[in-house]
Amino acid sequence: MGILGLSKLIADLAPQAIRESEMKHFFGRKVAIDASMCLYQFLIAVRSEGAQLATVNGDPTSHLMGMFYRTIRLLDNGIKPVYVFDGKPPDLKSGELAKRAERREEAEKALKAATDAGDDAGIEKFNRRLVRVTKEHAKEAKELLTLMGVPYVDAPCEAEAQCAALVKAGKVYATATEDMDALTFGSTKLLRYLTYSEARKMPVKEFSYDKLLEGLAINNREFIDLCILLGCDYCESIKGIGPKRAIELINTYRDIETILDNLDSSKYTVPENWNYKVARELFIEPEVANADSIDLKWVEPDEEGLVKFLCGDRQFNEERVRNGAKKLMKSKQAQTQVRLDSFFKTLPSTPNATNAAKRKADEAKKSANNKKAKTSGGGRGRRPK
């Protein structure tokens, strides 16, 4: 699910935090990619020929096709990807997973009804909703990446959190995912649409963490509370509080505890046994592998291994696979070209920029308190600058 309404909120109130670029703009960059998100995209993709990609036994192979050619495209553009795979979900996510299971059951019923009615559009729609990434899909993708010479990381828990840890440690430039909670985990850069197909002609959308904090006039802790109010995977949100009201409340009261002390209980109902504090701690201290101990290496591809793995039962075209392997080799040889900024040492993310945002937020808080004192503490939040 990510964070509900966050991207639009940033676009509306902190547009300076978003930049659109072509893929080639990221030449020479190392990027941590949410592997499960990619595999899902590949599995639901419909080939222009309309045929289902599958082995001789009928097992889908579209995830491998997507991973193979999309990774080659990234490398062709000078980007060095590292794929990060999900581990076990945190206990707090059980509620969200239960909701997904319910939606899946509803989709199965709707698919049956569409099939009985001969509704082709409905069949396609509900088939897509039933797609999920399995352990077998992930296992095959890892084997493929190894043969391609591309590194991957097994996260102990959430992939987005591990990606953010790699960014903060200076191991990679950005996190590439469609889930905005990578920012909540503290990734200083987030790239959306990086792994979309070239045919969709979507520019890569880059979000800057420091600029969004500055634009929203909040610090990192307040941003986490904002994301919880908007709606995240780890706890319920307060019904009736949308993005606009959420940022007003955070700008006025600065944390959820103070918001709850001042919230109109006749207007808003707080969820029973609301686990917002545990969710907050999960964002602040997620379960991740130590990024400093992770060694990322891009090595030469195994052409014969790729042919053996992808052709035969998986029915990939051998000539295309060999051509792909040659492109991988060519990109490996071209990696001697570097970005100008790579001549300077890349340091892990520091709190300096967020401290500046915090100072600005504290000033805003002081101003808000003065305003409340003058007006005897009105309940409405000020509109953020």
Swiss-Prot record:
Mg(2+) 1 binds at D34, D86, E158, E160. Belongs to the XPG/RAD2 endonuclease family. FEN1 subfamily. Mg(2+) 2 binds at D179, D181, D233. Its cofactor is Mg(2+). Keywords: DNA damage, DNA repair, DNA replication, Endonuclease, Exonuclease, Hydrolase, Magnesium, Metal-binding, Mitochondrion, Nuclease, Nucleus, Phosphoprotein. This is Flap endonuclease 1. DNA binds at R47, R70, E158, G231, D233. Interacts with PCNA. Three molecules of FEN1 bind to one PCNA trimer with each molecule binding to one PCNA monomer. PCNA stimulates the nuclease activity without altering cleavage specificity. InterPro entries: 5-3_exonuclease_C_sf, Flap_endonuc, HhH2, PIN-like_dom_sf, XPG-I_dom, XPG/Rad2, XPG_CS, XPG_DNA_repair_N. It is an enzyme of class 3 (hydrolase). PANTHER family: FLAP ENDONUCLEASE 1, FLAP ENDONUCLEASE FAMILY MEMBER. Its main location: nucleus. Residues 346-385 are annotated as: Disordered. Residues 122-253 are annotated as: I-domain. It is found in: Nucleus, Nucleolus; Nucleus, Nucleoplasm; Mitochondrion.
